[in-house]
Structures are given as C-alpha cells and as structure tokens.
Amino acid sequence: MSARHQEVMTVTVAVHEQPTLERLLGTVGEAMTRDVVLLAADMSAEMALRRLDHKAVSGAPVIDRGRVVGVITQRDLLVPTLLDDPAGSPALVLAGPRSRLIGLRVSDLMSEEPVTAEVHWPVVRAVRSMIDHGVNRLPVVDQASRPLGVLTRDDVVRAVAGHSRDRHGSGTNSED
C-alpha cells in the first residue's frame, strides 16, 4: 500500500471516527496552555515585541479591560520595521535608533475580532476552526471573552502524541 493511499485512508478514518477522535483527544481545556502571555491593547508596539521575544512566543492574545479583543504576532509587529531593514530580526529591530514602531500601539497592528475557542470544545472542533481561519493559535475565553488560556498548534500536537503514546505504549522497543 502506498504512503499516499495510507494518508488518504487515515484522513477518511479520522472523518468517520470523529466522535471517537473527539473523545480520545479530549477538550480544549485539557490541551490548552494556561500560562499565557497577554498583551494590553494600549501597550507600545516596541514593548510588545520585546515581551514576545523575551518570552520566546510568536504571538499573544490582546486584552482591553480584561477581555480578549485581538491577537498580535511577531510578524504583525515586524512588518512596519521591514521597511527599514528587510533582514531585520526582533533584537536588531529593537536596537535600531529609528524604529518605525515608535508611537505605535498594539491596537494599531493587532488582528481584531479574534477567532477564539471555549474550554468545553473538543480539540477536533478547535483544530477545524484553526484551519478554517488560517490561524496558529486560538485564545481560549469564557462567556464574557475573558482569557483562560491559549490553544496552539504545539498543544494540538501534544494532545495527538499523548493519545498515540497511550495507544501504542511508551514508544520503547522491548525486542533487543
């Protein structure tokens, strides 16, 4: 059987087995990251870029009055600076004396109307939402749009790997 045929079979099985897959992968609340970097809408863009760089994350939910109002990524913050230096990195951009970020706020550059998830959603539903909207992370919010965490692609991979490890054992080969 070809690798492509196996891949198609896997996708077909996944679609037909969605209720089982939902049960196995669990909920967004079980998979999400709870210790999340949050950026204030009125924070300077320069400070936001420094914070993302320092925390080693590529993006974060944006909050205003305790509610998620957007999402911002390093890319969103770097685009204005690329006009100065197309090869710029966050560290070099922040070291530059004439950064185009000066005077800009997170709210000027963020993606508004963020796609969000809820803790009770199945991970499968959240992944579908990520794919449909072309995003890599979903802020997880309560009914009042207050942040509870974030679900990232890495969180999804961990959920799948956890399921795979549980199903196939620890991954060690006992046949020496």
Write out the residue ranges for each language-model feature.
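Tandem CBS (Cystathionine beta-synthase) repeat/Bateman regulatory domains
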Residues: 1-176
